[in-house]
Design a protein with these regions (language model features):
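Hydrophobic core segments of alpha-helical transmembrane domains in multi-pass membrane transport
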Residues: 17-18, 42-46, 72, 105-109, ...
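Interfacial loop-to-helix junctions that mark the boundaries of transmembrane helices
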Residues: 1-6, 58-65, 141-152
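Helix-loop-helix "hairpin" substructures at the membrane interface of multi-pass membrane proteins
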Residues: 146-224, 254
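Membrane-interface helix caps of multi-pass small-molecule transporters
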Residues: 22-26, 47, 51, 77-89, ...
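Single transmembrane alpha-helix segments in multi-pass membrane proteins
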Residues: 3-56, 68, 73-94, 241-248
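Alpha-helical transmembrane segments and their helix-start/interface "positive-inside/aromatic belt" motifs
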Residues: 88-102, 194-197, 202
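Transmembrane helix-bundle core of multi-pass membrane transporters
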Residues: 104-168, 228
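Transmembrane alpha-helical segments in multi-pass inner-membrane proteins
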Residues: 208, 222-266
Length: 266
C-alpha cells in the first residue's frame, strides 16, 4: 500500500504540471519554463507558510490554505513574465522558458539554503492534505485505494477533467484551440489572440505551480537538495507527458500514473 501511495503522490505532481502545460500549448506556446514555474510554486508556498507562522498563526488548515494561495500568486507572476516576454516582446519561447527554469531553480535553492526562508514540511500541519476523507478507514481496502489520499490529488483529477471539458465542449476552448492552431484566422474572426495567450499561459502556470507545492506537501523527508532535484525532474517529465498523452488532459491522468509508476520503480 505504501508503494501505491508513493505512486499517487508523484502522479499528483506530474498531473498538475502536465495539465498546466497542455493549456499553454493549446494557445500555441511551448513553455519549457514549467520546471521553473513549479519551483516558484514551491517557493511561494514556503513564503506563505513563513509569513503566517511569523505572525503567530497556528491554525493548521489556514497554514496550508495560505501556502497554496501564495503558490498560486508566485506561479501567476512568473507566468505573466513569460507571457510578456514571449507574447508582447516576441522573444524566443525556448530560450525564455529555459531561462525561467534556471532562474526558478536558482531562486528556490538560494532562498532555502541561505536561510532567508525556512521551509518546513507542510504536510505536518494538516491531516486534511494527507487524508481528504477521514472515513476511508471504515471502507477497508476499497477506502485505502480510492479515499486515503490527500486533497491535492483529488483537486488535480478535477482540474484535469474540467480542463478537458472546457477545451473540447465550450466556446472558450474552441477559441483557445483556434488561437494555437491558426492565430491569423482567429484574429480575422475577431478573437483577441494576445488576450487568450496571456490568459492561457498564466492559468497554465498557476496549475503547474500547484505541482511544486504538491511535492512539498507530500515530501516525507524534505531537504533542499532532494526537493531541488525532484521538482526539476517532475517539471521535465510533465512536458514529456504532454506529448505522451497527445495533449489530452483526461488522458494525462492515466499517463501521470504510468510515468509515476516507472519513476517510482526506477
Amino acid at each position: 500500500m505504501l508503494f501505491f501511495t508513493s505512486i499517487v503522490k508523484q502522479a499528483t505532481v506530474l498531473l498538475f504540471g502536465t495539465t498546466g502545460e497542455i493549456i499553454t500549448e493549446k494557445a500555441g506556446h511551448l513553455n519549457l519554463g514549467i520546471p521553473g514555474v513549479m519551483f516558484f510554486g514551491a517557493l511561494g508556498g514556503c513564503v506563505g507558510l513563513n509569513i503566517y507562522a511569523n505572525c503567530g498563526g497556528n491554525n493548521s488548515f489556514a497554514i496550508v490554505l495560505i501556502a497554496i494561495i501564495f503558490a498560486i500568486l508566485f506561479s501567476a507572476i512568473i507566468g505573466a513574465v513569460y507571457s510578456f516576454l514571449t507574447v508582447s516582446l516576441r522573444s524566443n519561447q525556448n530560450i525564455t522558458g529555459l531561462a525561467i527554469s534556471t532562474f526558478g531553480a536558482g531562486c528556490y535553492k538560494f532562498s532555502l539554503q541561505s536561510g532567508i526562508i525556512n521551509c518546513i514540511k507542510l504536510s505536518a500541519y494538516s491531516d486534511a492534505f494527507q487524508h481528504a476523507f477521514p472515513f476511508y478507514t471504515s471502507l477497508g481496502g476499497f477506502g485505502d485505494i480510492f479515499f486515503s489520499h490527500g486533497a491535492l490529488f483529488y483537486i488535480a483529477i478535477i482540474v484535469a477533467v474540467a480542463t478537458g471539458l472546457i477545451l473540447n465542449k465550450t466556446r472558450t476552448g474552441l477559441f483557445l484551440r483556434a488561437v494555437g492552431e491558426n492565430p491569423a484566422t482567429a484574429d480575422a474572426a475577431g478573437i483577441n489572440v494576445t488576450t487568450y495567450r496571456y490568459l492561457a499561459t498564466i492559468i497554465g502556470s498557476v496549475i503547474a505551480g500547484l505541482g511544486g507545492i504538491a511535492y512539498i506537501f507530500y515530501s516525507s523527508n524534505f531537504s533542499v537538495d532532494s526537493a531541488n532535484a525532484a521538482v526539476d525532474a517532475s517539471g521535465w517529465l510533465s512536458i514529456a507527458l504532454v506529448i505522451f498523452t497527445m495533449w489530452k488532459p483526461t488522458l494525462s491522468i492515466l499517463g501521470a500514473f504510468v510515468f509515476s509508476l516507472l519513476s517510482t520503480m526506477g
